[in-house]
């Protein structure tokens, strides 16, 4: 029997990604959906119409039939007693109150930042720090909840942490410099990024983004010890920019390691991790977690955003970094709306389901 799930924030960009990605899911069945008071009481297909009657479906393809006629509820109308899990796609400051209310009764997998920086909350990337999911049991106990909140990281953190994991574990990465070239869609749709601002332009600053990347990467690569996560002993400097690309974040990364490293051994390491990655075989997992290219023109957003249906992290330009005694540099591409958002959250739920957390 499939697990019964709800999508909260179902009408927004991330909510629509959940709707699409949960279509015909072998383990999860969407039985309840919720959004703001403005959308509540309407059929889903009507809830995403603008005042002129235009359907604002942003994901591509058609709206899945399973959800068109489903009635959108308010948060208060969600019946948690009939749910096994909630996916939270709430994009506003209301996320904290909403997720707190729901987690008292049922597990919540979230794409919001509301709980990321709490001591008893792991920031989980399936395949990277699965062992930190044990902190969810401590969270339940600390807060006297029946459920828990398991957030994804910021979508810019996702690609960096995924590519840094093998370098940190095997080569003792100790310093990282990263510059991101982030897609317009990462800024959301309402209000989103102004077309006048980003067209024929690069915006060299995204508020609060760099602090998030530094803090989250160290937490994700850290170790769970005595009921707490000890952040990884790694120094991170980053510059986050917005570029005129629709979907997918590209990052230029320089890494200093404590041990000798060269491009070929790094490539071999990623290939080894591909063979043993914990999420292999899960419904939303890609065939290859990492794709490493020798072609110096890769990765590119237009070419690589659909690799592994947006769930593969693509790496290229693996080169020796001459600034360090031991170091490497590379480019990465990660799909901010797939692995970095709703579909990554579904993969996380699949991992937690296999661990009997759901």
PLM regions: where:
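Charged docking surfaces used in two-component/phosphorelay signaling
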Residues: 184-358
């Amino acid at each position: 029997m499939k697990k019964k799930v709800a999508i909260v924030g179902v009408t927004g960009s991330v909510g629509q990604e959940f709707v699409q990605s949960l279509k015909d899911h072998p383990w999860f069945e969407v039985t309840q959906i919720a959004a703001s008071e403005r959308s509540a009481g309407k059929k889903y297909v009507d809830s995403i119409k603008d005042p002129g009657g235009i359907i604002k479906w942003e994901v591509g393809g058609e709206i899945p039939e399973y959800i068109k006629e489903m009635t959108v509820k308010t948060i208060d109308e969600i019946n948690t007693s009939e749910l096994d899990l909630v996916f939270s796609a709430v994009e506003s400051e209301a996320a904290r109150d909403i997720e707190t209310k729901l987690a008292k009764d049922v597990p919540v997998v979230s794409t919001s930042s509301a709980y990321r920086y709490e001591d008893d909350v792991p920031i989980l990337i399936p395949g990277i720090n699965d062992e930190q999911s044990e902190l969810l049991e401590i969270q339940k106990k600390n807060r006297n909840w029946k459920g828990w909140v398991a957030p994804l990281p910021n979508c810019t953190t996702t690609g960096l942490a995924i590519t840094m994991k093998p370098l940190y574990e095997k080569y003792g990465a100790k310093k990282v410099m990263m510059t991101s070239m982030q897609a317009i869609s990462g800024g959301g749709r309402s209000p989103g990024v102004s077309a006048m601002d980003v067209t024929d332009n690069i915006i060299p600053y995204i508020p609060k983004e760099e602090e998030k990347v530094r803090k989250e990467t160290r937490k994700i690569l850290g170790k769970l010890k005595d009921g707490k996560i000890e952040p990884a002993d790694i120094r991170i400097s980053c510059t986050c920019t917005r570029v005129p690309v629709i979907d997918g974040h590209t990052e230029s990364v320089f890494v200093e390691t404590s041990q000798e490293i060269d491009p070929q051994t790094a490539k071999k390491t990623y290939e080894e991790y591909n063979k043993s990655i914990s999420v292999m075989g899960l419904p939303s997992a890609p065939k290859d977690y990492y794709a490493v290219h020798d072609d110096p023109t890769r990765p590119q957003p237009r070419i690589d955003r659909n690799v592994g249906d947006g769930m593969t992290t693509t790496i290229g330009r693996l080169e020796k970094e001459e600034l360090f005694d031991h170091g490497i540099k590379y480019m990465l591409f990660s799909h901010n709306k797939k692995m970095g958002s709703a579909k990554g959250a579904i993969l996380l739920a699949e991992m937690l389901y296999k661990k009997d957390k759901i």
